[in-house]
Amino acid sequence: MPIKSRIRSIPDYPKKGILFRDITTLIKDPVGFRLVIDSLTQHYLQEGMDFDVIVGIEARGFIIGGALSYALGKGFIPVRKPGKLPADVVSQEYQLEYGSDTIEIHVDALVAGQKVLLVDDLLATGGTALAAAALVEKVGGIVAEMAFIVNLPDIGGERKILEKGYSIYSLTDFEGE
């Protein structure tokens, strides 16, 4: 059973008119979770992509990024919501559909020039991913690529990210669905 068929779709969540792609059904299934991590691991081993560390975006990016870090023998760095990291941080505000939000990373999370694989569960508008990329660059890192389980290309995040010059890899797309 492929990855896409293990993802639950919830209409009108978190608000009317949104079709939410819920990966919890995918990752609660041990075969599904293994399929995600093994697929990403094989992709990055076969590509031979040069990166030093994985940066995961709170919260589901921690689940995927942590397991992938272990599988690839790479370190893991969290990007968190404000007030969750104990040492000095750098912050990045970004726009949501209604309002704004902020994410943070430790000032000393990366060494200048370190190459990063940025990981999250889903790419929709691209706002969170671009904010995380800005944080990585503020602390001296270089984004080698962004990886997602799900890409929703019709929402426009993929286009925004590619226009900024970043590379994207996703395991599955939901186009026009």
UniProtKB/Swiss-Prot annotation:
CDD domains: PRTases_typeI. Keywords: Cytoplasm, Glycosyltransferase, Purine salvage, Transferase. GO terms for cellular component: cytoplasm. Transmembrane segments: none annotated. It is found in: Cytoplasm. Its EC number is 2.4.2.7. One of its GO terms (molecular function) is adenine binding. It holds the Pfam family Pribosyltran. One of its GO terms (biological process) is adenine salvage. Pathway: Purine metabolism; AMP biosynthesis via salvage pathway; AMP from adenine: step 1/1. It catalyses: AMP + diphosphate = 5-phospho-alpha-D-ribose 1-diphosphate + adenine. InterPro entries: Ade_phspho_trans, PRibTrfase_dom, PRTase-like, UPRTase/APRTase. It is an enzyme of class 2 (transferase). Belongs to the purine/pyrimidine phosphoribosyltransferase family. Catalyzes a salvage reaction resulting in the formation of AMP, that is energically less costly than de novo synthesis. Homodimer. This is Adenine phosphoribosyltransferase. The gene is apt.
